[in-house]
Amino acid sequence: KALYAPFDATFPNQNQTRNKAVDTAPCEWYRRVY
């Protein structure tokens, strides 16, 4: 899951919580991470 790569490394348990927030705009979030 590249979408949660940054969170998976630091917050593997919070990756699920962020997933819901990213669900609203996965495309925009993906561009912000990279």
Swiss-Prot record:
Pathway: Energy metabolism; oxidative phosphorylation
Cellular component GO terms held in the UniProt record: mitochondrial inner membrane
Post-translational modification, as annotated: The N-terminus is blocked.
BP GO annotations: oxidative phosphorylation
Superkingdom of source: Eukaryota
InterPro entries in the record: CX6/COA6-like_sf (IPR036549)
Keywords of this entry: Membrane, Mitochondrion, Mitochondrion inner membrane
Membrane topology designation: Peripheral membrane protein
Subcellular location: Mitochondrion inner membrane
Function: Component of the cytochrome c oxidase, the last enzyme in the mitochondrial electron transport chain which drives oxidative phosphorylation. The respiratory chain contains 3 multisubunit complexes succinate dehydrogenase (complex II, CII), ubiquinol-cytochrome c oxidoreductase (cytochrome b-c1 complex, complex III, CIII) and cytochrome c oxidase (complex IV, CIV), that cooperate to transfer electrons derived from NADH and succinate to molecular oxygen, creating an electrochemical gradient over the inner membrane that drives transmembrane transport and the ATP synthase.
Binding partners and assembly: Component of the cytochrome c oxidase (complex IV, CIV), a multisubunit enzyme composed of 14 subunits. The complex is composed of a catalytic core of 3 subunits MT-CO1, MT-CO2 and MT-CO3, encoded in the mitochondrial DNA, and 11 supernumerary subunits COX4I, COX5A, COX5B, COX6A, COX6B, COX6C, COX7A, COX7B, COX7C, COX8 and NDUFA4, which are encoded in the nuclear genome.
Family designation: Belongs to the cytochrome c oxidase subunit 6B family.
The protein's name in its UniProt record: Cytochrome c oxidase subunit 6B
